[in-house]
């Protein structure tokens, strides 16, 4: 099954909700969209200039998202109830994920921090890492892993161990997207170097050439990862062995966020104004 829905406002990132729908940030319109299992689209205004960016399902059954434009974390229930939690001015939150501790963890691009927010809205700053932290994910080791877009490194944070950094071998790589896979590895994109990176928890960092400005990456439940090639209007599927298969999208699509839906299908946010479910 394939499905495409036109959604104005700059679809940027997606997350599967507990209600069986896909939830989408609309970075240009300051809104969140819901795409139901039947394809119906609902919109939930957030605020002008709020720039909703990354989104994650929380352990409380709500959707949590970063407001990069007005320094807030947003929470939206599946019934449409919106709550906001202010952060420091200029923090510019971007990446967000659910952690192993039942809280949400997020990056602050502007202030260079890693923050934590509990489901009842208590925020705390855990680390100042610099380097423009971008996306963040829960790792198979229950730490959070994040990309340092201007720091040319991958960071790992665990409340017990603190912060460690892995410098990338390619200079000026511009890492952005990051995900954890079922084979105990961390995968990440290098948008400025046209590469995909992989860090096994028990091995050395690896890099794979992947032209097309790779942006987001998501783990495939069947193994390997999918990557949005923002600069080439394509998607790539990369196996655990490094084999690459690409899929063309319409010209000017600007593919960004990727997420698997409750039905097991891959969904893609196209900043040009569409949300696409890839054919099975």
Curated annotation (Swiss-Prot):
It comes from the Bacteria. Substrate binds at residue 215. The active site is at residue 256. InterPro entries: Quino_amine_DH_bsu (IPR011044), Streptogrm_lyase (IPR011217), Vgb (IPR051344), WD40/YVTN_repeat-like_dom_sf (IPR015943). Mg(2+) binds at residues 254, 271. Inactivates the type B streptogramin antibiotics by linearizing the lactone ring at the ester linkage, generating a free phenylglycine carboxylate and converting the threonyl moiety into 2-amino-butenoic acid. This is Virginiamycin B lyase. It comes from Mycobacterium sp. (strain KMS). The lineage of its organism: Bacteria, Bacillati, Actinomycetota, Actinomycetes, Mycobacteriales.
């Amino acid at each position: 099954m394939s499905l495409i829905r036109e959604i104005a406002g700059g679809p940027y990132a997606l997350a599967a909700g507990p209600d069986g729908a896909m939830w989408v940030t609309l970075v240009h319109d300051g809104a969140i969209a819901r795409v139901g299992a039947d394809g119906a689209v609902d919109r939930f205004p957030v605020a002008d200039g709020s720039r909703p960016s990354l989104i994650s399902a929380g352990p409380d059954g709500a959707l949590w998202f970063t407001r990069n434009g007005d320094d807030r974390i947003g929470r939206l229930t599946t019934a449409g109830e919106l709550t906001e939690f202010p952060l420091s001015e200029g923090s510019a939150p971007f990446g967000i994920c659910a952690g192993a501790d039942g809280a949400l963890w997020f990056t602050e691009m502007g202030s260079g921090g890693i923050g934590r927010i509990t489901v009842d809205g208590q925020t705390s700053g855990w680390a100042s890492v610099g380097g423009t932290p971008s996306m963040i994910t829960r790792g198979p080791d229950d730490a959070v892993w994040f990309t340092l877009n201007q720091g040319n490194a991958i960071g790992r944070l665990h409340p017990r161990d603190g912060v460690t950094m892995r410098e990338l071998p390619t200079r000026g790589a511009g890492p952005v997207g990051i995900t954890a896979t079922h084979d105990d590895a961390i995968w990440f994109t290098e948008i400025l170097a046209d590469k995909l990176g992989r860090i096994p928890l028990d091995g050395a960092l690896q890099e794979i050439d992947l032209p097309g400005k790779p942006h987001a990456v998501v783990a495939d439940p069947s193994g390997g990862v999918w990557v949005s090639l923002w600069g080439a209007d394509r998607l790539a599927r990369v196996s655990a062995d490094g084999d690459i298969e690409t899929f063309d999208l319409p010209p000017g699509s600007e593919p960004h966020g990727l997420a698997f839906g409750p039905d097991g299908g891959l969904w893609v946010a196209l900043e040009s104004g569409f949300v696409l479910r890839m054919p099975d």
